[in-house]
Curated annotation (Swiss-Prot):
The gene is LSI2. It comes from Oryza sativa subsp. japonica (Rice). Changing S115N: In lsi2; impairs silicon uptake. Reduced growth. Grain discoloration. Reduces grain yield 2.5-fold. This is Silicon efflux transporter LSI2. PANTHER family: SILICON EFFLUX TRANSPORTER LSI2 (PTHR43302:SF13), TRANSPORTER ARSB-RELATED (PTHR43302). It holds the Pfam family CitMHS. Induction: Regulated by silicon level; the expression being decreased 4-fold by continuous silicon supply for 3 days. It comes from the Eukaryota.
Length: 472
């Protein structure tokens, strides 16, 4: 049983956490329009000032392995964009398209699979404008494709520890290996992706009629290859909390300091070598994850290998890192740790635990509803930080296998919960903002347009995926 701290400590800790929640959900409230990152830091400072957590404990609560993995993943993603990875994904979407329905299915499948490896937010940043172009060329409505992009990115990202930030937290806290995590959620992800795709086709069958294959404009492909980064990075706000935009900038071409071997090669050969190296090293990184090597140091090593072999000033690449996201996470770690020290989360869980056991259908249903609601009220990463250990402790009383199942269930539900509303995940907001600010074929995806599809999709996809969690 969890014991509550003193009444003043509980009250002050709750106030500090309420500030964090308010700024995470409403980052631009009129009376304090400081944004999510500053709001996270403010909450962390309040926890220390109110003596809810000591300064030493506050620093100790910052999870450096997670921050290191986030940082390295952003660097690797930047090099992959410059290597044309997303250009090829764009070509795959457009190649020999048989019409609007076929294109819809491609968007769902390609986005889901790419998000599992390159994070949901990255895929949404790069693919949104290209999807708008494809729809406009074929005289198809943009809304179904934007919904497909956002929802599939969230569903696909659930499959791996590197798909989204909350999965990173779960993987590190649970010590579940990359292969075990992948195989535990992959069946649910594949079925969920298919169900989501069928729902989109059913809801927009008439609108998706037509749209025969058209040739893909080379300039569009070039824009995708460049990640739309120089313009998009300035036109799209940093969206932190349960994701990041990871805007990229093209590597500077005016740096002439090169190894003599490179100077003997043509520029075309040099670029081909660097692109090939980026792909090979990234595959090696995934293989290292699969064999169980330390995820954080594997990603950092991969990032540094790309920096060294590029043999140019790394500052343009490092500038693409969303440092505000890393600061947001640091403040969030301190805030959640302080709130846990009040004993309030533990007391609430003690009340809910008897009804949320993972060895019964009713218990799993109750637990899933709690996770789904909290993920939309408090955001999914704080929900994972608050509930993870408590859920695992309760599952440990059942069996060791139940502990793994509980972590995987938390990963699945908290991620798919992001599809419930436009505010449910950063990926949704990125798609919305990118589409609204697109220089051509802009589209304003509203809250209500999203929720009409988001609510039934989230409930059904979550439900069909839960029985498949941990079955392999």
């Amino acid at each position: 049983m969890s014991e509550l701290a003193s009444a003043p400590k509980v009250a002050l800790g709750s106030i500090a956490f309420a500030v964090f929640w308010m700024m995470a959900v409403f980052p631009s409230v009129p009376f304090l329009p400081i944004g999510r990152t500053a709001g996270s830091l403010l909450s962390a400072v309040l926890m220390v000032i109110f003596h809810v957590i000591s300064p030493d404990d506050a620093y100790a609560s910052i999870d450096l392995p997670i921050l290191g993995l986030l940082f390295a993943t952003m660097v690797v993603g930047s090099y992959l964009r410059n290597a044309g990875m997303f250009k090829h994904l764009g070509r795959l979407l457009a190649w020999k398209s048989q019409g609007g329905r076929d294109l819809m299915c491609r968007v769902c499948v390609v986005t889901a699979l790419a998000s599992a490896l390159f994070t949901n937010d990255t895929c949404c940043v790069v693919l949104t404008e290209f999807v708008l172009e494809l729809a406009a060329e074929r005289n198809l409505p943009a809304k179904p494709f934007l919904l497909a992009l956002a929802s599939s990115a969230n569903i696909g990202s659930a499959a791996t520890p590197i798909g989204n930030p909350q999965n990173l937290v779960i993987a590190f806290n649970s010590k579940i290996t990359f292969p075990k995590f992948l195989m535990g959620i992959l069946p649910a992800m594949l079925v969920g992706m298919a169900v989501n795709m069928v729902m989109l086709l059913c809801m927009y069958w008439r609108e998706l009629g037509g749209g025969a294959e058209l040739s893909v404009d080379g300039k569009q492909m070039e824009a995708v290859e460049e990640g739309r980064s120089p313009a998009s990075a300035k036109s799209t706000p940093q969206l932190n909390g349960n994701g990041n935009t990871m805007m990229s900038l093209e590597m500077s071409e005016n740096i002439t300091t090169k190894h003599p071997w490179f100077m003997q090669c043509t520029e075309a050969r040099r670029k081909l070598f660097l692109k090939s190296f980026a792909y090979v090293v990234t595959v090696g990184m995934v293989v290292a994850y699969m064999v169980g090597l330390n995820m954080s140091w594997t990603a950092i090593t991969t990032a540094l290998a790309l920096v060294v072999v590029d043999f140019r000033d790394a500052e343009p690449c490092l500038d693409t890192v969303s440092y505000s996201l890393l600061v947001f996470f640091s403040g969030m770690f301190i805030t959640v740790s302080g709130f846990n020290k009040t004993g309030l989360p533990g007391a609430i869980w003690d009340f809910m635990a008897p009804y949320s056991k993972v060895n019964s259908v009713g218990g799993i249903s109750v637990l899933s509803v709690i996770i789904l609601l909290l993920s939309n009220l408090a955001s999914n990463v704080p929900t994972v930080l608050l509930m993870g250990d408590e859920v695992a402790k309760a599952a440990a009383l059942i069996s060791p296998a139940a502990v793994t199942t509980s972590w995987l269930l938390l990963a699945w539900v908290s991620t798919v919960a992001g599809n419930l509303s436009l505010l449910g995940s950063a990926a949704n907001l990125i798609v919305c903002e990118q589409a609204r600010r697109a220089p051509r074929n802009a589209y304003d995806l509203t809250f209500w347009q999203h929720i009409v599809f988001g609510v039934p999709s989230t409930l059904i996809v979550t439900a069909v995926g839960i029985p498949l969690i941990g079955k392999i």
